[in-house]
Amino acid sequence: MHYCNKDIGSFGETIAADYIKNSGYIILERNFRCKLGEIDIIAKDKNFIVFIEVKTRYGYIYGSPSEAINFRKQNKIYKTAQLYIIKKAIHNKFYFRFDVIEVILNTLNSNYSIKLIKNAFQI
């Protein structure tokens, strides 16, 4: 069953959040928004604060989900992360990383696949 893109994205973010919690991450924020943009998930992984972009798709018809994160989108995430770091005054306390989680949904049933790409991009 197909839903609108916003519903698909929200469902994928929930799957991704559960996945990283089960992988030992601590979720600090979900859907952090500011005037510069949005970050889907901000989490702590040991001594890293990780800014995670989640991309959810039905299959690979239009390429892998991570291919949708072009330089412009990366730059927007980076600037939003900078604002978060300043706002929380954590610039000297942690390392920082940008990860991507790809969620591929199955159109026939509730199965899905998930792929975590650590250090997916650097600016």
From Swiss-Prot:
It holds the Pfam family UPF0102. GO terms for molecular function: nucleic acid binding. Belongs to the UPF0102 family. HAMAP family: UPF0102. This is UPF0102 protein CLJ_B2665.
